[in-house]
Amino acid sequence: MAHSMDISYRQGIRSKGFAITCPTGTTQQTLSLSGLAKSFEGLIISSAFTATPQTLINPKQLRVTLTINNDVSIDDDSAMSYAIPAVGGFAGGFPFFIPIPRRLTGQDTISIRFVNAAASQNVDVTVWYRNEL
């Protein structure tokens, strides 16, 4: 029984969060996952406030590009397409993410770039991945 629980644990989905400050202009961030990561499952972007506390942001003003091992997976798209709304929560199940499945090797280069057309914003990016396929 312990062996089957070990396999189930290793195959389970995991998440890692990144807090990114996006001043006006372009911000690039490396998303470093565990060296055991074998499958990128997807991501979700969330942000409720600008760098000025209690000020709601408009995610439409953010553009996002996601690159996984030189493969541009999201190319200059509205961050709103990958975001949880600032109010009202979400109706999805758990885990809730935008699927962007990609194989990983454990020595991957994953980067996300935001282009911000307005005031500085704090953005949370949650990446979902698996250690085994």
Regions found by a protein language model. Give the residues of each.
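Beta-strand-centric surfaces of beta-sandwich/beta-rich domains
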Residues: 1-133
